[in-house]
């Protein structure tokens, strides 16, 4: 089975499971049923682009729309990479520019656009621009502290905007990294979303220190009781040598893979997505347009949020040019020629080579 077929089937399976999860809520069930048709249409659009123009459109996009955040989480990659620096004068795209990108993405067949930051909920104007593009599902990765009555109503009105609340584990682990009181505030947000019967998820950065806790039956049962139906596991990527002990090694990757498969069987009403762990089944790294790519707040098209290198701007050059960027092509070629995927972040492991490709040294 080739990559496009595998990913298309995986997306259909996700949507089918999402539909089963919302059968008790007619409002959301109608929305998911419509999105199932939209995903099928997007798959057809991607196929047409490939056949007629030779452009392999990825089904996923990651967009960092915010440069500010109300938290100071330890080891935040967005701050380290300069995405979030709380600088008001930092160059960012306008709502109109983001709207153009999102509409272009929908027209090309991109099904999911993950909104990140910074804290996306600090940019209500950009969220409104995204919400208008109803042919794309937008998981909104938020720390959960800004969800109140106003945002709960926003998510109820725009069901294609799916809140994904970040945690590090239970109270001690979350507050240790994110700040005192953040865990309880996140749970309060989950409770508000649950009462409105809204579909929402959580995102967990997994490290060598917390992966057993966040994959435990007790922790996942707690999330299920809170109404959470979607779990993103994102393996920690070091921002310098001092944090490399937190990154997975081969033995952690193998154990994590086994545990997640077990939990998928145990918690059939929850959707589990493991990144980059699930890439192993897809023959390696999906970044640089193979399965997804990243757009920064200024429009820079980058292989991945963890690989902040760019030679193309999506706002200036268009999304088609971003997908076909020389850097992305070089990375995909280098990966095919032997950048082995062991389960961790391939681009981090080859960061010097990626930078060299950008500088045309190879």
What are these regions (language model features)?
Residues 3-153:
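Conserved alpha-helical substructure of the radical SAM core
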Residues 69, 73-76, 285, 299, ...:
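Short cysteine clusters
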Residues 83-88, 171-177, 239-244:
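A short acidic, helix-capping loop that chelates divalent metal ions and anchors anionic groups
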Residues 95-115, 121-234:
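Radical SAM/AdoMet-radical enzyme domain recognition
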Residues 123-125, 129-137, 200-210, 239-272:
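Short acidic, glycine/proline-enriched helix-loop-strand junctions
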Residues 209-211, 230-251, 274-285, 310-311:
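Flexible glycine/acidic-rich beta-alpha junction loops that bind and position SAM and/or redox cofactors
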Residues 251-281, 300, 305-359:
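C-terminal accessory region of radical SAM enzymes
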Residues 286-290:
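Short, small/polar residue-rich loop motifs at catalytic or cofactor-binding pockets
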């Amino acid at each position: 089975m080739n990559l496009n077929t595998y990913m298309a089937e995986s997306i259909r399976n996700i949507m089918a499971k999402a539909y089963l999860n919302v059968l008790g809520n007619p409002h959301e069930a109608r929305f998911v049923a419509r999105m199932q048709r939209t995903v099928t249409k997007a798959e057809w659009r991607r196929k047409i682009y490939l056949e007629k123009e030779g452009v392999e459109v990825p089904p996923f996009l990651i967009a960092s729309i915010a440069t500010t955040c109300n938290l100071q989480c330890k080891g935040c990659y967005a701050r380290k990479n300069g995405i979030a620096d709380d600088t008001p004068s930092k160059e960012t795209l306008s709502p109109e520019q983001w709207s153009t990108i999102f509409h272009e993405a929908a027209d090309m067949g991109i099904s999911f656009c993950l909104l990140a930051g910074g804290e996306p909920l600090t940019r209500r104007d950009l969220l409104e621009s995204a919400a208008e593009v109803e042919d794309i599902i937008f998981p909104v990765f938020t720390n959960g502290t800004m969800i109140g009555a106003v945002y709960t109503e926003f998510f109820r009105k725009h069901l294609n905007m799916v809140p994904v609340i970040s945690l590090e584990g239970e109270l001690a682990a979350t507050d240790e990294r994110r700040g005192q009181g953040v865990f309880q505030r996140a749970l309060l947000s989950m409770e508000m979303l649950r009462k409105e019967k809204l579909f929402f998820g959580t995102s967990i950065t997994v490290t060598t220190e917390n992966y057993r806790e966040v994959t435990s039956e007790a922790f996942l049962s707690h999330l299920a009781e809170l109404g959470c139906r979607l779990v993103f596991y994102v393996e920690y990527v070091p921002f310098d040598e001092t944090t490399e002990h937190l990154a997975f090694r081969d033995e952690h990757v193998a154990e994590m893979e086994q545990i997640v498969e077990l939990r998928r069987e145990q918690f059939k009403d929850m959707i589990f997505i493991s990144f980059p762990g699930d890439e192993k089944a897809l023959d390696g790294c999906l970044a640089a347009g193979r399965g997804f790519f990243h757009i920064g707040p200024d429009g820079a098209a980058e292989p991945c949020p963890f690989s902040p290198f760019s030679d193309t701007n999506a706002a200036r050059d268009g999304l088609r040019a971003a997908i076909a960027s020389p850097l992305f092509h070089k990375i995909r070629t280098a990966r095919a020629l032997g950048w082995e995927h062991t389960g961790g972040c391939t681009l981090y492991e080859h960061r010097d080579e990626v930078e060299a490709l950008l500088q045309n040294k190879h």
